[in-house]
Regions:
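Accessory, usually C-terminal, subdomains that scaffold auxiliary metal cofactors
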Residues: 199-207, 222, 500-589
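Phosphate-binding site of ATP-dependent enzymes
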Residues: 144-234
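Glycine-rich phosphate/pyrophosphate-binding beta-alpha loops
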Residues: 260-273
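Terminal, non-catalytic domain-edge segments
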Residues: 290-349, 353-356, 384-425, 457-460, ...
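Conserved N-proximal alpha/beta basic substrate-recognition cap immediately N-terminal to
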Residues: 11-113
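Eukaryote-skewed repeat-based solenoidal scaffolds used as protein-protein interaction platforms
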Residues: 368-529, 539-541, 548-556
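Rossmann-like NAD(P)H-binding beta-loop-alpha module
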Residues: 108-132
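A long amphipathic alpha-helix within ATP-dependent nucleotide-binding catalytic cores
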Residues: 202-256, 277-288
């Protein structure tokens, strides 16, 4: 075996350690395993994976002090998470989640949670929080469902086996099980539904270790929600590896339960077709390689190819359709053929949404960025139209029209025309909505301009709107202006599927020059997504930007510590904290590959 690169430290020879050891031996990986109790002064490899979660507050403090000493010369998996105050404490986890409530999904609820030093303090908090019995008492540093007690009446708190200060208390949520979502290196490895066995004495516990029964969550809307929630939670805690537990109540509402930074995965592995040990050791190997050679744009491409099975379906389809359309390489199309049936099966449902404007008005009011809310209410059907048009477009441009071109026959032309004209007559809303509005106009042009010239787009009018003064606020104005212009160019290319008309290229050059000035005027606040999409558009129309090498340098310096993908490290973009995951940053990363690695198959013909 080669010189050891990875050290796995453990306390007990668990299923997880055995799985890691077996996978390392089969693949002849340079990994060594050692007992935590035998470690004295130094770590015998450049990368450390600490596999133990049995801690008290005192032992955690000692461990974290030792890890900090080692971190100067060793890459420690989950070190960023460990550095946060008391992150293993369940009460602290709920405090952190409460602090991040502004950018976590409103649909992921929190459970009323508190700690108490005395019995009187316990009763006061129960009253103040309006909690009814039963109440759940959990060891604040517990794991595997051990030591959890149900307090069915107020007097039960006097009979807990440990001191009150050792517990965290939560309102009891009647449930039909919970979900364990395993996040590895910025992506969700898999997710399972766990439910207490009816034969178990612990009918309130869903943990597999306490007799719970596990079932893999199938592809679908619920799985997409769980992936989105779990990756954002992992990002909040800056975790490379974690198990995110989400409770489902009897009505189907989802609640954040806890995060486990040393998750067991035997139950999940029994349901998953993918090896957790293989995935984790791949991430540890990448972490080692980053200590030797800085990752490159090619590293992004290799990473997303490798983790494709673990991306959300939305991210996976987005990545591989863009790579196929950009390069013409049929292997990218092949990679997502298995996803297409489920994706396209919703077209009829999307068309139904168009015929029910009231439901779309309601959803428009509650979704997306706040500054767009009024414009969405004025033009509520745009998102529903786009959902249909994009699926039909990619059916044609990626899969040669195998499925759903005929679905457009079900689109009411009068309603579409009135929606289109209303948007064109409202330049303020058009600019405010930016990306979805511009996409809608170009999709209408693509599908309907031949039969009805009123759908033909005039890019000079879009340029006038982009150059006009706006009052959205500095950050919102920048974001809207950049995406307004870049999506006009992407739309002109039929979303990467054809060359832009040579006659229109000079006008689009002017539009991109305006975008370049916008980015340059506020470079530190512009996101990597803004910048990479700008360079992609420059390649589409043959525009030579003075910012090319500046943006390339920023991309190369912006790799996450959790995997070979880039994130917003060197700018102040406000969404950074919730998107430091491979799934959340997929859009930016595929743009980076398109901008700086892959060649565009339609060479611009500049006139």
């Amino acid at each position: 075996m080669n010189e050891s690169r990875i050290f796995v430290a453990y306390r007990t020879d668990s299923f997880e350690i055995q799985a890691l050891r077996a996978d390392a031996e089969v693949r002849n990986l340079p990994v060594i395993f050692g007992k935590i109790d035998d470690m004295v002064d130094s770590i015998p490899a450049p990368v450390l994976f600490w596999r133990s979660g049995n801690f008290t507050a005192a032992t955690l403090l000692a461990r974290d002090r030792w890890l900090c000493q080692q971190s100067a010369r060793t890459t420690i998996i989950n070190f960023e998470a460990y550095r946060q105050t008391n992150v293993f404490s369940k009460s602290m986890q709920h405090a952190i989640m409460t602090a991040h409530v502004s950018f976590l999904p409103a649909a992921l609820k929190s459970i009323p949670t508190f700690t108490a030093e005395t019995i009187d303090n316990f009763h006061r908090k129960v009253t103040r929080l309006g909690i009814s019995f039963p109440v759940i008492a959990k060891p604040d540093y517990g794991a595997r469902g051990e030591g959890i007690v149900i307090l069915t009446q107020p007097a039960d708190v006097e009979h807990l086996p440990e001191a009150l200060s050792e517990y965290v208390f939560q309102a009891y949520v009647a449930n039909k099980g919970d979900y364990r979502v395993l996040v590895v290196g910025g992506v969700v490895h898999d997710c399972i539904h766990r439910q207490a066995s009816s034969a178990s004495n612990n009918a309130h516990l869903n943990n597999i270790s306490q007799g719970g029964v596990a079932e893999r969550v199938a592809e679908g809307a619920l799985r997409q929600r769980l992936i989105g929630y779990a990756t954002k939670v992992a990002s909040c805690f800056k975790a490379t590896l974690c198990g995110v537990d989400i409770l489902e109540d009897d009505a189907g509402a989802l609640y954040f339960l806890e995060v486990n930074f040393n998750p067991q995965w035997e139950g999940l592995q029994s349901c998953s077709p993918y090896s957790v040990a293989t995935h984790l050791l791949d991430e540890l190997t990448d972490a080692h390689d980053r200590t030797i050679t800085p990752p490159t744009i090619a590293s992004i491409h290799a990473y997303y190819q490798r983790v494709a099975p673990f991306l959300s379906q939305t991210a996976r389809i987005h990545y591989f359709t863009r790579m196929y359309l950009w390069t013409g390489d049929a292997s990218y199309r092949t990679a997502i053929e298995a996803d297409t049936e489920a994706w396209w099966s919703s077209v009829a449902r999307d068309i139904q949404k168009i015929s029910d404007p009231s439901s779309e008005t309601e959803s428009a009011a509650s979704a997306g960025k706040a500054y767009r809310a009024a414009a969405k209410l004025k033009h509520p059907l745009i998102a529903a139209y786009n959902a249909v048009f994009f699926k039909v477009l990619f059916d044609q441009t990626v899969f040669s029209g195998r499925h759903y071109r005929q679905e457009l026959d079900h689109i009411n032309r009068d309603l579409l025309r009135s929606t289109h004209q209303a948007l064109l007559s409202d330049p303020t809303s058009l600019f405010t909505l930016s990306t979805p509005a511009v996409n809608f106009l170009y999709l209408c042009d693509y599908f309907f301009a031949v039969e009805d010239p009123s759908f033909r787009i005039d890019p000079s009018k879009l340029l006038d709107i982009a150059q006009a003064e706006t009052v959205l606020g500095e950050d919102n104005d920048r974001d809207a202006r950049i995406y307004f212009c870049t999506h006009a160019i992407i739309g002109a290319s039929a979303f990467y599927s054809r060359p832009v008309s040579p006659d229109a290229i000079p006008l689009y050059h002017e539009m991109l020059a305006h975008t370049e000035r916008t980015i340059l005027a506020d470079y530190v606040h512009a996101s990597l997504d803004h910048k990479c999409e700008f360079i992609v558009c420059a390649k589409i129309i043959g525009y030579e930007s003075a910012l090319y090498h500046t943006i390339l340098h920023e991309v190369r310096a912006s790799f996450s510590t959790h995997g070979n993908y880039v994130t917003n490290v060197h700018n102040t973009y406000s969404n950074n904290v919730t998107h430091d995951t491979a799934d959340g940053m997929e859009h930016t990363n595929v743009l980076a590959v398109m901008a700086f690695l892959a060649d565009y198959r339609f060479v611009p013909r500049v006139k």
